[in-house]
Amino acid sequence: MNNMDGSENNAKVSDSAYSNSCSNSQSRRSHSSKSTHSGSNSSGSSGYGGQPSTSSSSNDLSDQKKEKELKKKKQVETLMPDTQIEVECRPEEDVINIPSEEGGAADDVLVPSPKQTLQTDNDIADIEVAIPDTNNDKEEAIVYNTSLINPGTACPFGRPALSNCNGFSCVISMHDGVVLYATASLTSTLGFPKDMWVGRSFIDFVHPRDRNTFASQITNELAIPKIVSLTEETDQTMENPGSTMVCRIRRYRGLSCGFSVKNTTTAYLPFLLKFKFKNVNEDKGNVIYLVIQAVPFFSAFKTSNEVLAKTVSFVIRHSADGNLEYIDAESVPYLGYLPQDITNRDALLLYHPGDLGYLQEIYGSLVKEGNVTRSKTYRMMTQNGHYMKVETEWSAFINPWSKKLEFVTGKHYIIEGPANPDVFQNPENVLKLTEEQKNQAKMYRDSIIRIMKDVLTKPAEIAKQQMSKRCQDLAHFMEMLIEEQPKPVDDLRLEIQDADHSYYERDSVILGGISPHHEYDSKSSTETPLSYNQLNYNDNLQRYFNSHQSNAFVDNNLLPSRNPLYLSAPHFSESIKNVPSAMEYSGDVIDLTGPGETSGVIVFNKSPTMGLKTGKPIRLTESSLTKHNAEMEKELMKIHREHRCYSKGDRVKVSNEARQKKKEHLARCNAGFQTISAANNTPSVYEKPHNLKRSSKQMESEPIANKHHCPSSRQFRRKQTTCSGGFAQPPSATNPVSTSSQWSSSPVNNVNPFILGVRMQPPMPILSPLPVVSGMFPMYYTPVTATVTTSEGRPSEPNYHRNNMNNNQFQQPLGNSRLPTTICVIQCGTSRIIHSFRGTRTTGGTRYT
């Protein structure tokens, strides 16, 4: 034993601040620090445990102490016969004894077996705890996988100082919050020996301001626990990341800090805690343990005003009123603030007062634009009171319903460190401001908050502009659909009966039913284009009112006796030339072949799109007709688009002109009706045929009298009872005929019922179809007998129509016998061809709609 003089250099006293609190917790430990130490002295009145020492006092005192220690040893062995702690002392190293008091209870908490302790703590040279194998059953009940709680080898945050950057790990019972196990790195990190933590409540070492946060974090984790059973054979390290939090843990004070308890400030070190819950199966049932891995935080700056080689960023989010809502845990080594300390504080207080003017402009642009790419360098305050320089990328979240700014998020890039590199030091009043500067800074902060709360954001303005534009587009669309209707004029009334939908497809009346949408170019994306049928119907009505039908009188006596298709009459050829443009671009081919007759082909070779310039006849097929219809639809849609491009004034002008034309046309029709009524009293040799299609253009060379076969006298037309072309019977000189009976009962009406929408008469019964020719559509014919009498009262030859086709003349001798007249209708798609026959020869014209 050495002298007492050297004992101060080789011994340390345990933390005196815990001398009283340790007595309560030590009583619950499975082992007692009151056990006699071999070769050591203890003092029960000092409040500290006895410390093994190499020095000794007089021989008398040592003998008395040995006797007392023997008595105490016997007492402890009777109280705790199952547990004994032996502490081996090394003279060259500082050995710390654990304070305790008498009367400790035994077997309250189980500790790990000595084998595992020696395996995981081989690097500890200070203290070795040995427990005799007196109760192997209880020791084997709890087996810890220490590989799960060993700290990492890298220090993720900041730079290591004098402490160990790897941190430490500990196991806590969730039953009473007592530390059951701690790694040996606890001593190098905080200065505490690991046995000082065992049996103590973990929350006693946590900073008072962080205890509520720690308790709430544990409670939240237990509400939805992530438990991995140790009895499972799977890897225990996967699929259980746990949760993290930042808190401050008390550091150990030794003799170097002095013996004064009241005048000494308690030091705390910030740690990043990672939680994991373990479910251990015991004899009493499942017990939940909490495994905590603590990694210390150190200041990220080493020198004053340090410029980091690698730019580091962290995120801060605050609300529109400046209240800080979130801060990254990665910001702790750079700012020094713990998230729970800075949350719910004014985020604008972090900015330097001299930079608030610039930040006011930044916030003004932020609420208008929605984001700011990257600001200039400005200053932000750290925990120690100094300022570091940062650059920030800003973004704002706008509530889509209220159009108000909800919160602002800033991603801050550190450019330069503060003047004091230790950001965890106590704050210093570095910046001293005058009252005027303080008032100005407060004014800037209030202005920034007012900007975030009151200024209307740009996304809201854009939304209003878009809504206004949509309303304008909708109004324009409605104006285009609902054009100004003409004023009601009694003379322009037109009674149109409901169309019989059995004669055409019902889908054609649907809006846009067969419209070529890909060919329709509309300014408004929401507008539904009109269908071709509707446009064609309107165009037919317009052409009906604007057209003046030109007719030719045919003298039956001038016809050769054997030429039913005599086409040399000049007035008839002129009327054929005045066929509407739709007829000129038809390109239809009709093949009419009778039994025992040569094939007769009628070709309308005027279509520029059908490639018929060679003059070769092409049969009327479905593909050619479909192609022709597509071209006509495109032309009609093009005309419709051109008319829509007119301004409102142009449309009004065109509407007025159309009404004026209708009035003039009606007047001419009425005048023509009066002329025809007067002419009925005089016998006439010629009569107008009714199976020719009217011309859409007025012929300059024809007299006015030939232009008034317009069915504008609606009362007269409604008295007609036929619906297909026929031959008129001229009035006799000896037997005059009234106006109501001057037409024969069999002729066909020359007005297209599909144009006027008039209901057609029921079709006549079909007698027999013609033989179907390859490449042709089936045709059906019905016999119609037309009797024509001359002025002498004897039957005369029928009145045949003349047609001029490629300057070819066909002649057929006329017989005195009465031949039946056949009407043939060919329809495909939107085209319809009507022919009348006498026998097997064609005797009629062509009708196209």
From Swiss-Prot:
GO molecular function: transcription cis-regulatory region binding; transcription corepressor binding
Region of interest: Disordered: 1-79, 680-746
SUPFAM superfamilies attached to this UniProt entry: PYP-like sensor domain (PAS domain)
Biased composition (Low complexity): 14-27, 35-58, 735-746
Record's compositionally biased regions (Polar residues): 1-13
Motif (Nuclear localization signal): 63-74
The gene coding this protein: per
PAS domain residues: 166-296, 314-416
Protein name, as recorded: Period circadian protein
Compositional bias (Basic residues): 706-720
UniProt subcellular location: Nucleus
Quaternary assembly: Forms a heterodimer with timeless (TIM); the complex then translocates into the nucleus.
A single cellular component GO annotation: nucleus
Post-translational events: Phosphorylated with a circadian rhythmicity.
